[in-house]
Amino acid sequence: MPFFDVQKRLGVDLDRWMTIQSAEQPHKIPSRCHAFEKEWIECAHGIGSIRAEKECKIEFEDFRECLLRQKTMKRLHAIRRQREKLIKEGKYTPPPHHSGQEEPRS
């Protein structure tokens, strides 16, 4: 037990904010993955962790993708590789504002 409980003195509950994104946020702004987490929690609530692992797999995968963005990053990496390949082959020339050659606007 801490000598001076800062969270209690300030009236904030950082532990709840950091564990569940669906919890009430300090500025009333929902987190990016609020909807996905809520669906997963609603699906898994009351059925136990073993059943929830099987029955709520789709909801959990959606929530995980929203948090980590692994599929999105993989897709962006593939697009970037294709773009670089086309530039190297001479089939695509990026616009000047993409390569930093255009003068800045005033």
Curated annotation (Swiss-Prot):
- UniProt main location, coarse: mitochondrion
Q: Where is this motif: Cx9C motif 2?
A: 56-66
Domain text from the record?
Answer: Contains two C-X9-C motifs that are predicted to form a helix-coil-helix structure, permitting the formation of intramolecular disulfide bonds.
Q: GO cellular component terms?
A: mitochondrial inner membrane; mitochondrial intermembrane space; mitochondrion; respiratory chain complex I
- Keyword Glycoprotein applies: no
Please name the GO terms of the biological process aspect recorded for this protein, alphabetically: mitochondrial respiratory chain complex I assembly
Q: How does it assemble?
A: Mammalian complex I is composed of 45 different subunits. This is a component of the iron-sulfur (IP) fragment of the enzyme.
Family per record:
Belongs to the complex I NDUFS5 subunit family.
Q: Where is this region: Disordered?
A: 84-106
InterPro entries recorded for this chain? NADH_UbQ_OxRdtase_FeS-su5
Motif Cx9C motif 1 mapped to chain: 33-43
Q: Where in the cell is it found?
A: Mitochondrion inner membrane; Mitochondrion intermembrane space
Disulfide-bonded cysteine pairs: these are: C33-C66, C43-C56
Q: Which Pfam families match?
A: Ndufs5
Keywords, A to Z? Answer: Disulfide bond, Electron transport, Membrane, Mitochondrion, Mitochondrion inner membrane, Respiratory chain, Transport
Function, as annotated, reads: Accessory subunit of the mitochondrial membrane respiratory chain NADH dehydrogenase (Complex I), that is believed not to be involved in catalysis. Complex I functions in the transfer of electrons from NADH to the respiratory chain. The immediate electron acceptor for the enzyme is believed to be ubiquinone.
Entry membrane topology: Peripheral membrane protein
Q: Which domain of life is it from?
A: Eukaryota
The segment(s) forming the CHCH domain are 30-74
Record protein name field: NADH dehydrogenase [ubiquinone] iron-sulfur protein 5
